[in-house]
Amino acid sequence: MTESVLDYMTRLGRAAREASRVIGRASTAQKNRALQAAAAALDAARDALTAANEQDLANGRKNGLEPALLDRLALTPARIDGMITGLRQVASLPDPVGAIRDMSYRPSGIQVGKMRVPLGVIGIIYESRPNVTIDAASLCLKSGNATILRGGSEAIHSNRAIATCIQRGLAEAGLPPAVVQVVETTDREAVGALISMPEYVDVIVPRGGRGLIERISRDARVPVIKHLDGICHIFVDEHADLDKAWRVAFNAKTYRYGICGAMETLLVDQRVAERFLPEMARRFQEKGVELRGCERTRAIIDSKPASEDDWHTEYLDAILSIRIVDGLEQAIEHINHYGSHHTDSIITEHQGQARRFMAEVDSASVMLNTPTCFADGFEYGLGAEIGISTDKLHARGPVGLEGLTCEKYVVIGDGQLRGQEPC
C-alpha cells in the first residue's frame, strides 16, 4: 500500500522528535565534527551535486521557469564553495546551548538563573535556492535542534543531494541522520501537514514570497518566525549631513535591489528637500533607478507620480518612492503606518532627533546614519542567520543561533524549604 502524505510527514516528525533529544544533548565538539564532516562530504560530492542540480535546471527550463529563478536555483562552483565555507564558519561560532546567565541569590537562599536550550524541532519551508538547505541545516544543527526541510519542488534533486552530504557528516560524528531531514515529496499537502504537527514540530520558519508566508501564518498550528515584507525607509532629517545622506541613501537602495533590507521609500524633511533631492536624483538616475515621487517631490525633481500603493510596496527592484515630509513626527507616522516593521534609518547629526526616531519607530532594527542593507546576521555579529523576524515574540530582527534557542530557569538550593527562614 502506498504511504499517504500525512503518514509520511508523521513518520518524519516522529523521527525528528526522537533525533532532537540526541542532538539537544550533543557536545559542542560533536556538533562541530558533524559540520566539518558535512563540509568535507560536500567538497567530495561536487560532481554529484552538479549532476543533481543540472536535473533541476533542465526541469525548470522545460517548465518555463523565469531566468531570475533559474539563476537562484543554479549551484555554480562558487556557490558550492560558499556552502562549504558556510558550514565551516558555523562550526567556528560560539555554541549558545547550555550557557547559564543572571544567577543570583534570593532572600530564601536559593540561586536563580537562566539556561539557554534548543527549541527542539524546527520546520523550514523555502523556495528555489538550494543553498538555503545548508544555511538552515547548519544553524539548526549547531543550536542543538533537529530540522525538517521542505524546499521548493523545483530544487528537489539538489536538496536531496545536499541532505545526503549533511547526513554523512552526522553519521561520522555519531549523530542520527534524522537530525536533518529533507521532505522528498513534492506534494503540496506536505506543507499543510508540516505546519499542523505541534506534537512533533516546535516552530516553523518560512522563507519565500508573501503568499507563502501569509498562508503559513494563517494555517499553522505551531509558532511561526517570519517577516512578510521588507518595506524599509531612510529619513533625511533637517539636521542631516547631506554628503553623508547622499552616500548612505544610495548604498541603501543600490547595494542589492533584491534583498529585504533594501530601501524602498526615501523620506526627506521639507527644510532640506531643495538642497538634497536634485543631487540625490542625479545619482539614482545615473544608476538607472526609477523614481516615483509625491507632488512636492515632483516640484523639485523629475520623477513619475507616486500612488498610495507605492508607499505599501516592496519593489525588490530598481524603483524608489520618495516623499517630502513636514518633519520628524510625520516621518515616524509614515513609517509606522506604511512600513513592514523591518528596518528603518534616520540620517541626522542631532542626537535628540535620533533618539526620538529610534524610540518611536516600531521596527525590528532602527538605525542612525546607516544604510538599511546592513540588516543582516553577519553584519550584526551573529555569524549567520536563518531569516529576519518582524514579530515581537521570541525573536525579533536577524535570527541567528541564539534565536533558535530559548531559556529555561535554573534553580539551585541546599535543602531550603519554602515558608521557613534560611538558617
Curated annotation (Swiss-Prot):
UniProt EC number: 1.2.1.41
Pfam families: Aldedh (PF00171)
Keywords (A to Z) from UniProt: Amino-acid biosynthesis, Cytoplasm, NADP, Oxidoreductase, Proline biosynthesis
Reaction(s) catalysed by this chain's protein: L-glutamate 5-semialdehyde + phosphate + NADP(+) = L-glutamyl 5-phosphate + NADPH + H(+)
GO function terms (MF aspect): glutamate-5-semialdehyde dehydrogenase activity; NADP binding
Cysteines joined through disulfide linkages: none
Listed SUPFAM superfamilies: ALDH-like (SSF53720)
Main location: cytoplasm
InterPro entries, alphabetized: Ald_DH/histidinol_DH, Ald_DH_C, Ald_DH_N, Aldehyde_DH_dom, G-glutamylP_reductase_CS, Glu-5-SA_DH, GPR_dom
Subcellular location: Cytoplasm
The keyword Amino-acid biosynthesis belongs to this UniProt entry's keyword annotation: yes
BP GO terms, sorted: L-proline biosynthetic process
GO cellular component term, pick one: cytoplasm
Record keyword Transmembrane helix present: no
Enzyme class: oxidoreductase
Pathway(s) where this gene product acts: Amino-acid biosynthesis; L-proline biosynthesis; L-glutamate 5-semialdehyde from L-glutamate: step 2/2
PANTHER family: DELTA-1-PYRROLINE-5-CARBOXYLATE SYNTHASE, GLUTAMATE SEMIALDEHYDE DEHYDROGENASE
Functional summary from the UniProt entry: Catalyzes the NADPH-dependent reduction of L-glutamate 5-phosphate into L-glutamate 5-semialdehyde and phosphate. The product spontaneously undergoes cyclization to form 1-pyrroline-5-carboxylate.
Family: Belongs to the gamma-glutamyl phosphate reductase family.
HAMAP family, A to Z: ProA (MF_00412)
Name of the protein: Gamma-glutamyl phosphate reductase
Gene encoding the protein: proA
